Design a protein with these regions (language model features):
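Short, charge-rich, low-complexity interaction segments located
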Residues: 53-60, 120
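Short beta-to-alpha loop/turn elements within the nucleotide-binding domains of ABC transporters
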Residues: 12, 41, 60, 77, ...
C-alpha cells in the first residue's frame, strides 16, 4: 500500500495528469477537490477514455474520464480481501480507508509483490 496517495484537481488536463503519473511513478491519481475525493483516474483510464478517443488531451480533464465512485477497502482488511474485491469489481486500484477516510491506495502490483515475497516456491530443482 502506498500511503498519502497522489492527487490532482478535477480541472487538471489529461496530458498533465499523465505526466504527473509518469513523474511520480504511479498508476493512479485520486481526483480531489479540497478535502473531498471525487474519483480516481488510472493509467487504463488514460488509454481507454482519453488516448483511444483521439480527443485533445490538453482540453480533456481528469474529471471527464475519472472513475466514480472510488472502490475502497478498510485498512483492517487483509490482502486476500483486497485481491477478491479487485477481482469482483474488475478494478486494479483500491482506495484504502481508515474510519471511512482515504489514507492510501493498493494496486494489483502491490498484491503481486506481496504474493511473490511471501509465497512458497512452487517449482524446485532436483
Amino acid at each position: 500500500m502506498r500511503k498519502n496517495p497522489k492527487t490532482v484537481a478535477p480541472g487538471t488536463s489529461v496530458r498533465s495528469a499523465a505526466k504527473h503519473m509518469r513523474d511520480e511513478r504511479v498508476g493512479s491519481l485520486f481526483v480531489k477537490k479540497g478535502s473531498l475525493f471525487l474519483g480516481i483516474v488510472t493509467d487504463t483510464d488514460l488509454v481507454r477514455r482519453a488516448v483511444a478517443t483521439s480527443k485533445d488531451l490538453n482540453k480533456l480533464t481528469v474529471e471527464d474520464i475519472m472513475t466514480t465512485p472510488i472502490a475502497t477497502i478498510e485498512s483492517t482488511r487483509g490482502v486476500q480481501d483486497a485481491h477478491d474485491m479487485m477481482g469482483d469489481l474488475g478494478v486494479r486500484h483500491l482506495g484504502v480507508t481508515v474510519a471511512g477516510t482515504i489514507m492510501g491506495v493498493i494496486s494489483v502490483r502491490d498484491l503481486l509483490v506481496y504474493y511473490q515475497r511471501y509465497s512458497e516456491p512452487k517449482i524446485t530443482q532436483d
